[in-house]
Amino acid sequence: MNGTTQNNAALFDGGVFSPYLTSRLPYWAGVRQNVVGSTVDGRPVAPANSSTLTYATIGPSPLDTAAAAAASAAASTARSMAADFSFYNHLASNAVTRTAVREDILTVMLAKLETLTAQLEELSQKVEELADATTHTPAQPVTQ
């Protein structure tokens, strides 16, 4: 980050490392939607630095200074997150936990299916035995 002061205002030049800023804007926002990337005002950005957007203040007002400071903080945070994977560890551990829970649920469902299959086979055998018993018995004459 570079900063200078002029007329009681701080001016910052900084970068925010995020393709999210241009790739997620709708077409009507005036930002070119292309694979190369684009700056906020629509100018193309070379692939080597397509994820870098430069922010600079427009005039010496407190609002511009606050915007530049926010952009600088965002850039610093983005660089920290890119360099330090501890920000993402809880996401990875949650994903592992969800996967383990899904595997446990699938194991329980598989066991229930195996039990149902065994019960169905047993029921099929009983039905077959009853069918054989009723078809092989000689017919009894009906007397009145």
Swiss-Prot record:
InterPro entries in the cross-refs: Hexon_assoc_IX
GO biological process, one term: symbiont entry into host cell
Induction: Expressed in the intermediate phase of the viral replicative cycle.
Subunit structure: Homotrimer. Interacts with hexon protein; this interaction tethers the hexons together. Self-interacts with adjacent proteins. Interacts with kinesin light chain KLC1; this interaction leads to capsid disruption at the nuclear pore complex during virus entry into host cell.
Family: Belongs to the adenoviridae hexon-interlacing protein family.
Other noteworthy facts: This protein is only encoded by mastadenoviruses, and may therefore play a role in mammals tropism.
Protein's UniProt name: Hexon-interlacing protein
Source organism of the structure: Human adenovirus A serotype 12 (HAdV-12)
Lineage: Viruses, Varidnaviria, Bamfordvirae, Preplasmiviricota, Tectiliviricetes
Chain's gene name: IX
